[in-house]
Curated annotation (Swiss-Prot):
This is Nuclear transcription factor Y subunit B-9. Heterotrimeric transcription factor composed of three components, NF-YA, NF-YB and NF-YC. NF-YB and NF-YC must interact and dimerize for NF-YA association and DNA binding. Interacts with PRN1. It is found in: Nucleus. PANTHER family: CCAAT-BINDING TRANSCRIPTION FACTOR-RELATED, NUCLEAR TRANSCRIPTION FACTOR Y SUBUNIT B-9. Expressed in green siliques. Present in etiolated seedlings. It comes from the Eukaryota. Its main location: nucleus.
Length: 238
């Protein structure tokens, strides 16, 4: 697949002196060329000025690495699927153009506001302005989560207590919030929860005592662990 020249504006044009050297030099060198400037008083003395070649960005440096492109594409494909070379290059050029497009728009905003650093808000603003509104909300959630993780990591390095983090599953999506202590004890102190409370109405009883005979609850008996009566959760099915 032959590519065009989407990044041709990155190539620096040759200067007038370099064009004259290319036209009048009989033995041009590919790397450097020299210009001999004669001295005003002595014709034998001259100053050799080395001319550097024009800085032209290589094509492979203008695109996202193909290995990264293939890795991202394979995440959404089954293991037995194959990707042709032209498909890889098409996605590579598309992703590279997209990055350049959004970054250029964000850079213009920074220049108007006389700022040197492009922030995440600049990228989101540029994407919204260019019509990529569907990406703004998910990326906003991602950026907020990323900043919270970085804040917790910095607190851990400084020895500060991290915030309460409850992670759901293995995908890294979690809830971050302030740490909370135990709730205040009830009128009977810290005790065990009666089964009648689980069924929709009951009370807290200190030391797990419900005020009833154990044999009358579900018709079963419960054992004692460390001096505390343990409730038989399956007594109602006996």
């Amino acid at each position: 697949m032959e590519r065009g020249a989407p990044f041709s504006h990155y190539q620096l044009p040759k200067s007038i002196s370099e064009l004259n050297l290319d036209q009048h030099s009989n033995n041009p060198t590919p790397m450097t060329s020299s210009v001999v400037v004669a001295g005003a008083g002595d014709k034998n003395n001259g100053i050799v000025v080395q001319q550097q070649p024009p800085c032209v960005a290589r094509e492979q440096d203008q695109y996202m690495p193909i290995a990264n492109v293939i890795r991202i594409m394979r995440k959404t494909l089954p293991s037995h699927a194959k990707i042709s070379d032209d498909a890889k290059e098409t996605i590579q050029e598309c992703v590279s153009e997209y990055i350049s497009f959004v970054t250029g728009e964000a850079n213009e905003r920074c220049q108007r506001e006389q700022r040197k650093t492009i922030t995440a808000e600049d990228i989101l603003w540029a994407m919204s302005k260019l019509g990529f509104d569907n990406y703004v909300d998910p990326l906003t959630v991602f950026i907020n989560r990323y900043r919270e993780i970085e804040t917790d990591r910095g607190s851990a390095l400084r020895g500060e207590p991290p915030s309460l983090r409850q992670t759901y599953g293995g995908n890294g999506i979690g809830f971050h919030g302030p740490s909370h202590g135990l709730p205040p004890p009830g009128p009977y102190g810290y005790g065990m929860l009666d089964q009648s409370m689980v069924m929709g109405g009951g009370r807290y009883y200190q030391n797990g005592s419900s005020g009833q005979d154990e044999s009358s609850v579900g018709g079963g008996s419960s054992s004692s662990i460390n001096g505390m009566p343990a409730f038989d959760h399956y007594g109602q099915y006996k």
